Amino acid sequence: MAAFTFENFLSGAYTGLPIDKFRALGLNTEDYDEQRWEMLVKCVDSGLMQFSCSRDEALVLLWNEEELPKDDDDEVPYEVPCWTPDTDATVIDDVSEWLAEKTSVRDTVVVCSDYDAVSETPVEVLSVELEEDSEEDTIADVCLDARRKSFRDYFTIVEEEFVEEDPLISLNDGNVCPVRTHEVTSLEKPVMLDVGRRCDRVNLESLQGAINMNLPSHAYFDDTWHQYFVEGSKLDVDFDNIRLRQSEVFCDRDLDRYYQPELFAGASSRRIGTQKEALVAIRKRNADVPELADSVDVERLSESVAKKFLSSYVCDLKPVVGVMEKMRAYHQKWGDKIDPMFLLKEHNLQRYEHMIKTDVKPTVAHSMHVERAIPATITFHGKSICAGFSPSFTALFDEFQKSLDERVVIPSGPISTIEMDFDIRNKYYLEVDLSKFDKSQGLLHLEFQRKILCKIGLPAHLANWWCDFHYKSFISDPRAKVSFNCSFQRRTGDAFTFFGNTLVTMAMFSFCYDTRQFEKMLFAGDDSLAISSSPIVGCSDYFVSLFNMEAKIMDPGVPYICSKFLVSDELGRCFSAPDPIREFQRLGKKKISADNDDALFEQYVGFKDRMSHMRNFSEYEIQQLKIFFNLKYKQSGEVIEDYMGACMFYSDNFKNFKTLFTKTCAPLVAALNKRVKDKPFRLPPSL
């Protein structure tokens, strides 16, 4: 055996007994534990530990359970006690205080700086690491660099199911598991911002410039006095049969009662339902029904359309078997809210009330300076009739959605979202724009609609009854004193409007295109979008020749439905992004009451909800939005940056949002005049 010297020991050349090494370091031999000492020597010699002292000093410090000196060159921002399998989970409360330091491909060591936070000694912790290192399988790398990309990465959807008792619970609220993430940042080296935030330089002038670039004819459009011109001029309209009486509604608009928008994006003024305005709207929305279709056998064609509908969309009719029970539950729930003193009387279901919408839908066409926008009309039953039919159609719609093929999405009811686990990149898109949708529907649409309702679970007597009072109806406007007859056309405000429009759109679409070529199909009223991986084949001429519809196939096709673009993230998940032009056209409303801030605050809440996820867009998603915007509007997508910044800035707080609207001083002056009139100013008695 070689002679023992302290220099040989330090150099590792000495191979004597372990207790001799222990004694040479000046440690007490009475405390000697051979197993523990050998384990410490192996740890130091293996190179797993990082320390800035000599080998013998490290052995002495580890034996005395003292802290090793840190290496000044290695900066560790945050250090936390080691977490072993026996450690109590309640010891470590903050994820941001621990960090894994990777030293090699095989080994991952957790740097330990505070041993009082855990129950194990340093020797026990190191022994656990050696046992894990001795296993045959390599240790997986620990990745804690979880960068926050978007709001949806905080949660993971576990499941989603329909709740039979209360459909409101099923509004896409599944159980979620929070994903705990953290960011490691050195406090000594502040992070410099190379690129400013999009909301830093937002102002009304730059936003108005972006709107003027995309909508050049909308910036200087002002129709404040257009309705006065209509009321004071001669009106020539042609009707086959219409009844008029003296109306008491006048175009007396108090402009000072409403907020005035600061953005000029082509928003129309509030329309008043005078008799002339009602006649213009009826002429546009109900009269002049297009006759584009050829002569067809209505009975045979309606049966073929109904069969094609079922084979294309419905995969399981079991959910609609119990629809009657659910209808009964809805009716009982509604019946409990009826006043027991409610007067029961008969109603003629063929009679509808009529009114015009005070809001005019903004348009993106560059024709506002040439053609005046016509308001839409609403044809509806009374509250009692709608309350009687709504439970039946609501129950049927809920069960109908459950029976649809997984490729079909109707963003309404229990599934009121367009978020999907579906990648829309590198696809072919088909968007069909159906104009004059309501008044173009005739006997054929009513017949195949009735047969579809019977096949998906609605009782035959109820379906026949509902369709019977659509064959011929009598519509009257009690304010404008206008009444006329109407047949077959869609009633725009009854209990079956959205569901019926969706069924008609789906039925016509399935008859014109083979639905097996599509991977996803989205329908909402008269809007439709189909996505395919191969070039789309079909016959769009059937929309005109068979169904009497004016159909326009959007070219180039983009993923756009319900005034929203569809984009995909890096993981292939699809979600909706609001159309920026449509959003800022809504901010030009001229019918927000200025009596108090409640009405304006409601507009702010709605805008904030729609823009909630816009600030979390990644650059990858913004580039998609720019491309789709360019394809749809034939405009440069660079203005998306201005829109994104404005969305974030004006949705931050109500104070920023309020700068988009101004209030005139006329209401304050009127209130002051009223106060002076009621209580005139008088000199004080002392004078």
UniProtKB/Swiss-Prot annotation:
It comes from the Viruses. GO terms for molecular function: nucleotide binding; RNA binding; RNA-directed RNA polymerase activity. Pfam families: RdRP_2. GO terms for biological process: DNA-templated transcription; viral RNA genome replication. Keywords: Nucleotide-binding, Nucleotidyltransferase, RNA-directed RNA polymerase, Transferase, Viral RNA replication. It catalyses: RNA(n) + a ribonucleoside 5'-triphosphate = RNA(n+1) + diphosphate. InterPro entries: DNA/RNA_pol_sf, RNA-dep_RNA_pol_alsuvir, RNA-dir_pol_PSvirus. Residues 427-540 form the RdRp catalytic domain. Disulfide bonds: none annotated. The keyword Nucleotidyltransferase applies. Belongs to the ssRNA positive-strand viruses RNA-directed RNA polymerase family. RNA-dependent RNA polymerase which replicates the viral genome composed of 3 RNA segments, RNA1, RNA2 and RNA3. This is RNA-directed RNA polymerase 2a. It comes from Pelargonium zonate spot virus (isolate Tomato/Italy/1982).
